[in-house]
């Protein structure tokens, strides 16, 4: 009787999947050293390219991975029919960056989990971690086989700029965390299609779009086409995605990395588009669409992936520690205190410590002390995890690098009786104030108007640390006397009275808060909308998010003389015409 030839021993260069013929002929189980990835979390496994045993090759890791779904980009590798551009399973801290040889536009997903280190740790079965992409948590960013396009120093510093067209944005009504990965991809592609139909001259406008499915119609809201079709300069860095008009240098949007929750390329008919979901005070949660020149969209996606990988690695090198009441506010960048909002129950905060819930207790403010909370200090990516953090208020063209040593040691302010800072509920940093009160002894009755905000969206990772009741330090008499000599200082003035004095864009004035003695507010008109910015932080320092000033007069003259806008929470305020007080 003829015997079947023995089944060859498992070769790691072969596809792990056995054909039905081999299974029937074998009758034996694979060797014990064969990895057994979860069938529910692994898609078709691609063999590594022959001769390419670099540890950064994405495919070489797949036999060791679980909880990872692979799907090919549109028109991807033959023999598989995966979702276009998908490189990671939902809920895992993985970013799929651009792969030059795998189709037009791979995806980036769950990027805020990289920026914050949130989400479940990727499970690795068999073998040890290897390669630069691998972190101690088993997460990685699959860089292109040719490597990243730009030097790390450039991405961590001033950023990489691309000339693209901004096509507008579409409101996203649900948190991306509540959606599965397929739906997230459909949301971004549907948003691209909606914008292509609405904007004349869009590359994808000629194709026939299928009607929006019912689930997507409940997720996508109104479109904002205010700047649609405008050529812009997109600057990608570990700090943010900055969108600036190419002609007038107006900043259209500045989305901090921790506010970006999902990014994707278009389908084969809209391959030159990049879309990402982010939150900002103007559009709330929205999907922003960019039209790239031919062949550039993949480079944009790859650069965004590089920025998130660097940001995540810096986070892992300097993870936040369990802070104590004395250093809990170290690294505070002022993004919560410097702007007034009209509706206090719906404040949105940017958290510079992604993935970390605000600790309770403690009223001593040590945020600017050198050496305090070294684990909570920013690693190296500007704005969220970098020692060179300068916030979002950098002038156009100014490098974002810096040295944390420039932060001077500031002692905590001495206790001061009387009114406490931020009693006015119109200030942006009063959210969670009652939680802090209860944690330190229940000082004051709870205020439902302040503490009744909607549940936070953990996926967007923007809950700011609970505000502290820090009494303001005594203001020097010289500052008050100096302001009285300034023509744009109007003394104590309410918000409504101040807004009534503004007529043209660029008009501004400075007023003293009617509720908090010693606090000064800059009121200006930008794009027809009044803005109110606090000028004195809880420690009594006159500052914006990137500079500290000797006085309010110094701050005003600095921005007026240099024609620099003050940027706060993604919007800017230009100081052009001072509104002089009437004698």
UniProtKB/Swiss-Prot annotation:
SMART domains for the chain: PTB, SH2
Q: Which GO biological-process labels does this protein carry?
A: actin cytoskeleton organization; angiogenesis; cell-cell adhesion; cellular response to growth factor stimulus; defense response to bacterium; epidermal growth factor receptor signaling pathway; heart development; insulin receptor signaling pathway
Keywords assigned by UniProt?
Acetylation, Angiogenesis, Cell junction, Cytoplasm, Growth regulation, Host-virus interaction, Mitochondrion, Phosphoprotein, SH2 domain
Residues recorded as bearing N6-acetyllysine in the entry: 154
Post-translational modification Phosphoserine, affected residues: 36, 139, 453
Q: Which residues carry this modification: Phosphotyrosine?
A: 349-350, 427
Q: According to the UniProt entry, which residue ranges have a biased composition of type Low complexity?
A: 16-44, 372-384
Annotated GO CC locations: cytosol; focal adhesion; mitochondrial matrix; plasma membrane; Shc-EGFR complex
SH2 domain sequence ranges: 488-579
Which part of the chain is the PID domain? 156-339
Compartments where found: Cytoplasm; Cell junction, Focal adhesion
Q: Does the keyword Phosphoprotein apply?
A: yes
Can you name this protein? Answer: SHC-transforming protein 1
Which organism is this protein's natural source? Homo sapiens (Human)
- Quote the gene name from the UniProt entry: SHC1
